[in-house]
Amino acid sequence: MANFNLDNHISKTPDFPKEGITFYDISPALEDPDVLAQLMQDMTKLAADFQPDIFAGIDARGFLFSMPLALALKCGTIMVRKAGKLPGKVLEESYALEYGTARLSMHASRAVRDKKVVLCDDLLATGGTLA
């Protein structure tokens, strides 16, 4: 796709979910098959540089990207969920949002120690999820 600019395919809503915060909606990019194909091609090239062992999709829209990336690079993927969504023993981590804090969790049995993990989320606003 010549002159591809992803920003042209993301809608922005100012002051949502609260004043001073801009909500970035990726839905328009996902609805256009040409944009989606270009996005996945670009993300696959970028992720391949890291030579990942596994991908981790952040709940929930990160799942949209982690699975096709894992398939393209012949890796597995795990789901990192919002706190309280998984039964059994879990590992949890808190992170700061631009409007508060949140927790993520994953099953403690998921073997990611000593592996190269690429985290997938739907956007990067503050970096709080990845901190």
Where are these regions (language model features)?
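PRPP-associated nucleotide enzymes
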Residues: 1-131
